UniProtKB/Swiss-Prot annotation:
Single biological process term from Gene Ontology: icosanoid biosynthetic process
UniProt EC number: 1.14.14.80
UniProt source species: Rattus norvegicus (Rat)
Gene designation per UniProt: Cyp4a10
Domain of life: Eukaryota
Organ and tissue specificity: Expressed in liver (at protein level) and kidney (at protein level).
Subcellular localization: Endoplasmic reticulum membrane; Microsome membrane
Name of the protein: Cytochrome P450 4A10
Membrane protein topology class: Multi-pass membrane protein
Function comment: A cytochrome P450 monooxygenase involved in the metabolism of fatty acids. Catalyzes predominantly the oxidation of the terminal carbon (omega-oxidation) of long-chain fatty acids. Acts as a major omega-hydroxylase for dodecanoic (lauric) acid in liver. In kidney, may play an important role in omega-hydroxylation of (5Z,8Z,11Z,14Z)-eicosatetraenoic acid (arachidonate) to 20-hydroxyeicosatetraenoic acid (20-HETE), a signaling molecule acting both as vasoconstrictive and natriuretic with overall effect on arterial blood pressure.
Modification Phosphoserine occurs at: 439
Gene Ontology annotations for the cellular component aspect, listed alphabetically: endoplasmic reticulum membrane; extracellular space; intracellular membrane-bounded organelle
Binding site for heme: 320, 456
Similarity comment: Belongs to the cytochrome P450 family.
Amino acid sequence: MSVSALSSTRFTGSISGFLQVASVLGLLLLLVKAVQFYLQRQWLLKAFQQFPSPPFHWFFGHKQFQGDKELQQIMTCVENFPSAFPRWFWGSKAYLIVYDPDYMKVILGRSDPKANGVYRLLAPWIGYGLLLLNGQPWFQHRRMLTPAFHYDILKPYVKNMADSIRLMLDKWEQLAGQDSSIEIFQHISLMTLDTVMKCAFSHNGSVQVDGNYKSYIQAIGNLNDLFHSRVRNIFHQNDTIYNFSSNGHLFNRACQLAHDHTDGVIKLRKDQLQNAGELEKVKKKRRLDFLDILLLARMENGDSLSDKDLRAEVDTFMFEGHDTTASGVSWIFYALATHPEHQQRCREEVQSVLGDGSSITWDHLDQIPYTTMCIKEALRLYPPVPGIVRELSTSVTFPDGRSLPKGIQVTLSIYGLHHNPKVWPNPEVFDPSRFAPDSPRHSHSFLPFSGGARNCIGKQFAMSEMKVIVALTLLRFELLPDPTKVPIPLPRLVLKSKNGIYLYLKKLH
């Protein structure tokens, strides 16, 4: 036999041997994964044995919850299963969906961490800021940032809010004469971003005029959808597989757009603080705004807040501070448009307090109680954040005696709670009197800003902004629904509409 033939035979044998070993290893890995799948599934089945649920596939879980009907399916379960039910995403992944105020009170009164399996998927986008942090790091960041939302800080923000809102309303004046309805969410999103930039990030100028910011708004919308898709895809839980997928490429590109925006905001303010006069002026303030707190905390102690931590907090508040408020306001406007009698009563109340609206102050916001009731009722029907997830750090027993072991992930369905007929009679009816001062309700029946120690740090900022937006808008426009474009709510990180939120604008003067 020739040397070349012998070498070829050895090479072929080596390849064959390698393939055999690879096949054996592959089968072993598959077997290990199958055993892990089985054991995890059995553990979950045992953990949830006290909680009935709709029928589900052994591998695909509750497939009927996918798509546009997800909220409708959840509401069917709210009516049929008391307090909570397990939702299976696939054979070895399930959450207990909770929509009972007593259950909510128990979970929110504990110190369970955010569910890592879900929220870690957000880390490439918003980093580990207040939303994702747990334990002592979360406590330290929360304590550091709480002063940014003190009443003394928020009061002068009303002027900034009003300036941003009037700019949007001026744009709407040009559109009001058209025969077609307009999609309001994009306009409102730019306006709330403008407000956050002015109030929390010391930004001069207007986001609504600069067309460059539209790409950031679009990126945030894409990230919402991509995150939602990834949570529901078993294969995309693996970072490597996801990063090589088309959705992974889109997600990373959108993250880069969002990061470019926040990096620019941080750099601009850091450059301004290099000016000794500006720095001294800021340090003399009795209370600092959000970004200055972050920057000065780092400047006074270089180890206290890293660049990574700094950007995580900016990314988190930039998203939460504008997108959730934009969602809330858009749905509030839709609710008022579809209930003109309540819209008119709000308008009359605002007119009695503000006149023509040329001036609005913090003190005015407590003088529009009926408008506030309507805002809260709209937030009940359309909660900006439809759900949050916790992972049990210890076992828990609920008031009805049912229990869960450590490690189970619990989804607090704010949407389900707010539409639960056992909590809110006739839950689909828009009834602002539910929030009258003398109207009794459970302490955990209304949670648009979550509850407990980890409630939304900016809830007072958001409520104040929504009051200013609604008041000034109703003085200039009548809001009318477009019956040909009824919005379809979708449960993303923030409650969105599949087909936008379209309204007709009728100029009043």
